[in-house]
Amino acid sequence: MSNPATKIEILYPEYGNQGGDNGNALYLEACLPKENFVYTSHATTPYFVENTPSAIIMGGMTEAQQELIISRLMPYKDRLAELADQGVPMLFAGNASELFGEKIVNPDGSEIEALGLFKFTTTRYMPQRFHDVQVGEFDPGNGKEPFVVVGFKMQFTLTEGDNSNCYFLKNKVGFGINKESKLEGFRRKNAIATWLIG
């Protein structure tokens, strides 16, 4: 039996479904009753603004939707940082992760200010696309044994930033945040930004 106090917030499910990345939410929905989920759409104030959710999840989207969601979340970026520092689990997968860096650079050199939860810059290289299979080790850092995570990456972007002390995975197979890196994603306590999908 589930605890009705458990509230998992799915941010912008109408957008966060690129590459089937809404599968993270669908899996949780198959495991827990509907009462455990809160869905924030573009027309509503996020649940996390006035409440502390049990977890926050968002999947990948189009570039135009990225910019729309940044504008929607910008007034609440300090609250997101506060929740991350409190240890609230968050998973931003695929290009949803890019919303939480410092900026996104377009192919024409123009820049989009991002939410700043993590210290990285993302550069868009459209129409060039980067694909990769990922096999990496995740260390929960809580005294439990590290375990292997397998996934796939499909993106128009590469990222610059120092994640040597805050990475999500140490890859055995596949590139990390860019082609020179083996360290995938960023982590701030239990908040994870990763380009992995699937």
What are these regions (language model features)?
Residues 62-140:
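Cysteine-nucleophile active-site neighborhood
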Residues 107-185:
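Pocket-forming structural segment of enzyme catalytic cores
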Residues 1-85:
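N-terminal beta1-alpha1 cap of cysteine-dependent amidohydrolase-like domains
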Residues 3, 52-53, 86-88, 110-113, ...:
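Short coil/turn connectors at secondary-structure junctions
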Residues 55-59, 91, 193-195:
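Structural motif
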Residues 1-5, 10, 123-128, 136, ...:
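RNA-binding accessory domains that recognize and position tRNA/RNA substrates
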